[in-house]
Curated annotation (Swiss-Prot):
This is DNA repair protein NreB. The keyword Endoplasmic reticulum does not apply. InterPro entries: Nre, Nre_C, Nre_N. GO terms for biological process: DNA repair. It holds the Pfam family Nre_C. Interacts with the DNA polymerase sliding clamp (PCNA) via the PIP (PCNA-interacting peptide) motif. The gene is nreB. Coiled coil: none annotated. A motif (PIP motif) lies at residues 384-391. Involved in DNA damage repair. One of its GO terms (molecular function) is zinc ion binding.
Length: 391
């Protein structure tokens, strides 16, 4: 199994990811802390249905909302985001996903969109290793906790209160309701993970919840944009950010989607000497299998669907990402979602043909565009369609 495709998910059957240990910085805190949680919660996946549930708290008080709100990180350097995340200390409890005292605390924390003062008492001093994941933002130190107490909290947003008390509202409908009322995607993910949405409520591992929300919301938006006319010309967006290049080619044809990644050597998931290129795609009627590129596929699809909905058009979207040497810390799928949102808020160039669009991409890409074309299902399909129309 290729490391680029596995990404620390242990699909290679190893007991320990060989890439992760070298990525863990040294952090330390006291045995007991009182701090302002953004708020932030984490639900693990190992041992399900008995999993780790963790309130996350920095060892200080104040306005910490930005520490767990990816929507606020678009203009923040990655190094600064990592500082935020390393200060978030996890108090670990082992609990059943359905009900326990600790579950109730985590559920209450998830309701708020402003910082709350939380006290955590640890059974032993927190470890000096930070926590990394391919889907989640990093966390700082962690340790088994004896007790967690919420000292003060604001009132939850009204939309959140409504779905929390409506136990007949399905989780999918609750997500849509919250999203349409301006609740941040990251907050909806937190609510789903804490088991505060739906009819049969239970904790959902945080990495699953993040992807589930991106997937669910984007599918709902896609069904809407399928009713719109297609764009008239090819549009190309480009964004260079934090040793990454993002490119989107929007084509004047019915909805379909492709996400591709090119990992250069000395990056998070590529310790070889060659550039690794992977793509995955779906047609007009969507997909029935989990994307091989994992959570980034769904977060990028959401950002793309949001843009098309905003302009009330549909298109075939070919979206590629190049990751350059030195970008070697897994920071979570939020980075893709928020960078694409930033890109789609910017300017684009228009072209009459796919070939012209590809030539433009080639000027910005460090990778020969031929490598992308070789891996791209939708570029090949677009070329065949153009040839057929010409004949």
């Amino acid at each position: 199994m290729d490391c680029i495709e596995c990404r620390g998910r242990m699909l290679c059957s190893r007991k320990v990811c060989p890439l992760m240990p070298s990525l863990r910085p040294q952090v330390s805190v006291e045995r007991d802390i009182l701090g302002s949680s953004p708020p932030s919660v984490f639900v693990g996946r190992y041992g399900y249905p008995k999993v780790r549930i963790c309130p996350a708290v920095p060892p200080f008080t104040g306005d910490t909302k930005i520490y767990d709100t990816p929507e606020m990180w678009r203009e923040v350097p990655v190094e600064r985001v990592l500082e935020f995340r390393y200060s978030m200390i996890l108090g670990q409890f082992r609990a059943d996903v359905r009900r326990s005292k600790e579950v109730e605390v985590v559920q209450e924390m998830s309701l708020y969109d402003k910082p709350i003062d939380v006290e955590v008492s640890f059974a032993k001093p927190p470890s000096v290793r930070a926590f990394f994941d391919d889907v989640l933002p990093p966390f700082g130190a962690s340790a088994p906790a004896k007790e967690v107490i919420i000292h003060s909290a604001p009132r939850p947003p009204k939309a959140v209160e409504k779905v929390y008390y409506d136990t007949d509202l399905r989780a999918v409908e609750a997500m849509s309701y919250l999203y349409e009322r301006g609740v941040a995607v990251s907050h909806i993910q937190k609510l789903l993970s804490a088991g505060t949405l739906g009819v049969k409520r239970k904790l959902v591992p945080t990495r699953w919840a993040i992807t589930a929300v991106d997937d669910t919301l984007s599918k709902q938006i896609i069904e809407e944009i399928k009713q719109y006319e297609t764009i008239d010309r090819y549009r190309v967006f480009v964004l260079k950010e934090s040793k990454n290049l993002f490119v989107a080619i929007l084509c004047p044809s019915p909805w379909s989607y492709e996400w591709g990644e090119a990992w250069y050597p000395d990056t998070t998931w590529n310790r070889t000497r060659k550039v690794g290129v992977l793509t995955d795609s779906e047609g007009f009627f969507g997909r029935t299998t989990y994307a091989r590129l994992g959570g980034c596929y769904y977060s990028s699809r959401l950002a793309t669907a949001e843009y098309l909905r905003r302009i009330r058009r549909q298109a075939t979207a070919i979206v590629w990402r190049e990751i350059y040497p030195g970008f070697n810390v897994p920071i979570g799928v939020w980075f893709v979602r928020e960078m694409l949102r930033k890109m789609y808020a910017g300017k684009y160039c228009e072209f009459d043909t796919l070939e012209d669009a590809l030539r433009f991409v080639d000027k910005h890409s460090n990778l020969d565009v031929g490598r992308w074309i070789e891996k791209s299902t939708l570029v090949k399909r677009g070329r065949q369609r153009t040839l057929w129309e010409f004949m």
